[in-house]
């Protein structure tokens, strides 16, 4: 309320101030010259406002002033984008319109009229535009939107601060919807002039009813349509209500022992909800409870089974929470009713007839007390005395004493003591005994075999003792010759005697004695007794000897000693006959006269004399006692112990086989008594340690165990055995098998072509088997691996592969494989070198190499040949040996297996000195061969050859040809063709320029064509291919199948018919053909010009020079096909020339190169190569049909030393040709040097 009063007073003061200023500035009547005047206005920030100004003189200049600042007569009012003049100036309307007002617009305004012809200057009264700024936010402490925890009854301070506003807002604080009266507010200046902030402070004391309610701070202002609010939720902590125990039933605390009691305890209210626990006599018994937040209830249920000792126990439930001042409690005292836990009868219910029986009955503690009564059968007996005493747990104990006379007819009746009470009407408590009245038996007898009957030992006999009457039941005791019969506790005799228990049938009692008869039962007396009564019977038992014993006159025997053995049969019924045998062989003995023995039987004896040997050791001498009447024999044996020195048995192993790196066991089969004291092994004169070693151990049986056996362990082992009687010796052989190892292999093995040779492989192996040698030939083709034409020979440790009439195809790598059954097999590679005379590559009768003869270029001549052994190359020029000491000549020689190359590099080629015929001669020990190479000038190319059709469609034809000599410069190809019946030729350049296949497109179906081919380079055109012979072609019709051979190599995809209109396509193709023809014709004309220029230059040289003659002759030469097919280098049957240019040549082999300057020859360094690889793959392919030399280099396998060129000694051979004139990219004739624009010779 105080805050509202303060705010209203501030607003009233502001209103009075504004009203006074208005009254001061604006008179009561409208001044002259104005028909409308501005008024004081109040608007909310962000709204639009209009100050009216109507002038009676429309032509006057009008402007507004803001706090004395002139805004200018411009209606757009520059510098104030939100200001503008509204209205019709012609009517004198100059209203000031302000958009989106803000605090800067809060000022005094006046409308001013300038002097004019129509009237004097005028000024309107000043008016005030008041801008109301609403508060944007409220800052609440504690923070708005949170949950604030307070304790009920305590005072707390809440602060609420408004944001900037004009005028100062009115702040109200509410809790649970009720306005808080204890509040104070302070109005402070805002962040800008004319703005205010209000800070309100309230003191709040929450109640439990405020829990989960909102505390709201509201700020109201004339600038707000509705108050703004900020709030937080109050979490009020308060203690719970007292706990209440909900007792089931009306009698609180009364309960019966054994009852399952469930007591709920409920505490309502509280924040947090109450924590409950149960106590019994002050001790916690349950701390589990549950809560129901929707009903604000805490509940705990105590579950217990009531026992008698719980009588008088105090059960209480306690409730409290974190803000409780103390613990609230509700308690109940238990009153427990419980019956006696047991009834006990003291005294014995067994008595002799006609004597008194005295008993006492006592009940355990009960609440309330119980009464006792006695029953005998269905007859109630009266007690002599009854007593009541205090018991446990507040209960009582009852006791009753009884005395009565025992009679025989009452025997077996039930005597019962019963306890009862009105509190336990549904239960009966009693204790019962069986009355036992004692009296004696009347008769006793035995049932069993009749006396005098002969029973064989082992027979099962059943004796039954019977008696009539008697209580207690007669025990019926059995006796044997005055000794009590009992079952033996020894396991071996557990089945001999079985004594049954006393059994009753009516008034008759019986007890069974079952026994298996033995010698001790013979003539024995068996008696049964029951009290003073007894009965007896006697058995007659026949039995074999109870024991047969052998007595000896000596214990230690040696071969040749005499031994006397006596056999004694202790007792038998009837008497027995004795006999001797040794391991089944019957012996004669001497019998002694019979005599009396135990168990009323008879004894017998018989002796035998033996002479022993070592073979008798361990043998058994058996004495047999036989009863003819019983048909049974009892035997006993004596084992002979003969002392003798060690003797090796016949099954002793003499040879033991083992595998290297495996184990071996040298067994011992020896016989000795006593056992050998030591086993001593020796090997090659050295004794093996009995304690064992790194690779051997002597077993307890004397056997020798070896492991990690090596071939050095092979040999004879000697064993010495010794005991106290003497020594013995044996020899065993250990045969160690080991994997084969190739010891000798002649690598390489050399043979001349057509000769014979043996490839010898010698091994070290054990065992040596006849078929353990195998041979393999290493090659890529199965045909290369066949050994059918070779002979395999094996003799002992040496295997041979014999080759007859050696051929070049048999040269290469072979592998000797030896397998004697012990892994791993041995393998080793070797090389077969087939020596043959050199064979130089003869691609054509004459090879041309072009180079510029201006003494600035270099040329390289390549000569390649095959041959074994290594080849030495020599060069001649025009038949004269070439002087390689001349620095202008450099030769590089390369060797790779049987392929050899010589590169002759001529520096500063001179037309006068070097345009000549060079001859390369390859020589080895078996012969020589040579070839010629012509060094010529750079010239126009030779005509291509072999133009043929490889594919044909209605609109295209695939062509293929072989290029001619390019003249030492890059050459290109041009195709000329014409359609029969159509005038004019068509020219097509082949793309890419150096391709040798091309697809000619744009043809018409079912049309005959003629095709020509020519080549050109920077110096001119060649003649037409195949001496100008035309190639006739007829395209198939659209419905005819197209011919496309399997080996077609098209370079451009055929452009067949498509969905485009045919006429535009034909026009486009025609335009392309015209352009192509123009280019070809232009090229021909230009080449002719160059040729005329070259001919002019050549006229100044010697017309009859030898070089020019040779060149011209060679250019016109053709391959005649007269050479032998084995030396031909082409793969087809057509006779075509072969040319080699410097641009085409690049060594395909990077072999170990050697620069031959003075000495040449085979160094033999390659003999240590680890793997021969395809040593003579290229040699094996010397004679295939029409075989070319090209694949020769592709198939050569390089060794690891051949993968790079030595950088320190040799340059990359491909760099030799870097300066060849043919490598110049000068395709334009004008850019060609003058001396290269024609033939110099």
Curated annotation (Swiss-Prot):
Residue spans of biased composition, Basic and acidic residues class: 1099-1114
Outcome recorded upon mutating residue 724 to C: In NPHS1; does not affect protein expression on the cell surface
Keywords carried by this UniProt record: Cell adhesion, Cell membrane, Developmental protein, Disease variant, Disulfide bond, Glycoprotein, Immunoglobulin domain, Membrane, Myogenesis, Phosphoprotein, Repeat, Signal, Transmembrane, Transmembrane helix
Region (Disordered): 1025-1057, 1099-1137
Domain Ig-like C2-type: residue ranges: 27-130, 143-234, 242-333, 340-434, 440-540, 544-635, 740-832, 838-939
Listed result of changing residue 367 to C: In NPHS1; lack of protein expression on the cell surface
Post-translational modification note: Phosphorylated at Tyr-1193 by FYN, leading to the recruitment and activation of phospholipase C-gamma-1/PLCG1. Tyrosine phosphorylation is reduced by high glucose levels. Dephosphorylated by tensin TNS2 which leads to reduced binding of NPHN1 to PIK3R1.
GO cellular component: cell projection; cell-cell junction; extracellular exosome; focal adhesion; plasma membrane; slit diaphragm
GO biological process, one term: slit diaphragm assembly
Residues found modified as Phosphotyrosine: 1193
GO molecular function: cell adhesion molecule binding; myosin binding
Outcome recorded upon mutating residue 736 to M: In NPHS1; uncertain significance
Result, substituting residue 1096 to C: In NPHS1; uncertain significance
SUPFAM superfamilies membership: Fibronectin type III, Immunoglobulin
Signal peptide: 1-22
Outcome reported for the amino acid change (mutating residue 366 to R): In NPHS1; lack of protein expression on the cell surface; the mutant protein is retained in the endoplasmic reticulum
Effect of residue 528 to F: In NPHS1; lack of protein expression on the cell surface
Transmembrane segments: 1056-1076
Clinical note on disease: Nephrotic syndrome 1: A form of nephrotic syndrome, a renal disease clinically characterized by severe proteinuria, resulting in complications such as hypoalbuminemia, hyperlipidemia and edema. Kidney biopsies show non-specific histologic changes such as focal segmental glomerulosclerosis and diffuse mesangial proliferation. Some affected individuals have an inherited steroid-resistant form and progress to end-stage renal failure.
Xref: PANTHER family: IRREGULAR CHIASM C-ROUGHEST PROTEIN-RELATED (PTHR11640:SF31), NEPHRIN (PTHR11640)
Cited function: Seems to play a role in the development or function of the kidney glomerular filtration barrier. Regulates glomerular vascular permeability. May anchor the podocyte slit diaphragm to the actin cytoskeleton. Plays a role in skeletal muscle formation through regulation of myoblast fusion.
Family membership: Belongs to the immunoglobulin superfamily.
Protein name listed in UniProt: Nephrin
Gene assigned in the entry: NPHS1
